From Swiss-Prot:
Catalytic activity, reaction form: D-mannonate = 2-dehydro-3-deoxy-D-gluconate + H2O
Cofactors (names): Fe(2+); Mn(2+)
EC nos: 4.2.1.8
Entry protein name: Mannonate dehydratase
Enzyme class per UniProt: lyase
Family under the similarity heading: Belongs to the mannonate dehydratase family.
InterPro entries listed in its UniProt record: Man_deHydtase (IPR004628), Xyl_isomerase-like_sf (IPR036237)
Organism: Photorhabdus laumondii subsp. laumondii (strain DSM 15139 / CIP 105565 / TT01)
Record's function text: Catalyzes the dehydration of D-mannonate.
UniProt keyword list: Iron, Lyase, Manganese
Higher taxonomy: Bacteria, Pseudomonadati, Pseudomonadota, Gammaproteobacteria, Enterobacterales
GO annotation terms (biological process): D-glucuronate catabolic process
Source domain of life: Bacteria
Pathway assigned to this chain's UniProt record: Carbohydrate metabolism; pentose and glucuronate interconversion
Amino acid sequence: MEQTWRWFGPNDPVSLDDIRQAGATGIVTALHHIPNGHIWNKDEILARKTLIENKGLIWSVVESVPVHEEIKTRTGHYSQWINNYKTSLKNLAECGIDTVCYNFMPVLDWTRTDLEYSLPDGSKALRFDQIAFAAFEIYILKRPNAEADYTVEEQAQAKVYHDNMSAADIKKLTTNIIAGLPGAEEGYTLAEFQAQLDRYKDITRDKLREHLAYFLHQIVPVCEEYGLRLAIHPDDPPRPILGLPRIISTIEDIEWLTTIEPSPANGITMCTGSYGVRSDNDLVEIIKHYGNRIYFTHLRSTQREENSKTFHEATHLAGDVDMYNVVMEILREEYRRKKVGDNRLIPMRPDHGHQIIDDLKKQTNPGYSCIGRLKGLAEIRGLELGLRRAFFENK
């Protein structure tokens, strides 16, 4: 696997020098300062690429070129936004960058209720609490008919949870959910957030699928012409939230995706932390069946709790994700490609990381502290080395 690292640009507290010292060779980044929907021009792309290469690294993957909300709802100026997207893809390809991660999640990127969940060893992790989220939806946001998405028991627990919240607790939970996280590109006030949700009130799962299919049919020919690889990121969490449809959450969704647009340019990001939240997602089977469409991997693990919809982020080799067999299957896919003349490694980044050691004293991007990811990368690197030596070299 190609060892990569997500970098949020010049303002990231983790520097390119730090990343190189961590042992990564590839950078995963985006032009976060460009508003969603606007064209990434070549000057901007080359400036970022040069900055990376001057530190002895390469820009391996774009994460992400954000998809404008009007493309997802297929309203307003969606045609113009798609044309802009095509131009950005073309410009990236002509600058020598050929792998683009993106997502089609309505309104929000990845969502958590707690960005500083304390673990028994004193480290901090990201957490999604189903009951806290229910309290937010029902009693803070007051989304119409939100109760229908929760069991009677969950509703009762949410009421108790909300009744025990202080004003500061409510503000913090609201901020965690709607203010935007690294990669989300946009943040919202409560009123703005509800207005964004309302834009989807008539958009069903099937309708959102139709909109993604239309988008792919428009951009895949550009990818084919310029040798680009698309890698859609799964929903996080991988289920409907806030009354919004989610369409990239399961192996059945991947089957639909690759059927409606069979071009090899239409690929996936194998995010084990997102898919792995669902106990009915067999990660190894996903890799076995769709390995030829995996162009990017995010390796992390989560731990489901007593309420199976509540989870926190585990260390990279622990939790519910069988990282041993996941990495084994990724290596099998790499060797399969090698046999047919494709020697390119699959880009992998250690996704998220606990806030540990000296980073506990620093201001860090939630999930993207340096030392936690350094630890995760080292663990995965060691696992890969052991598997390669034991099962693949000279065989």
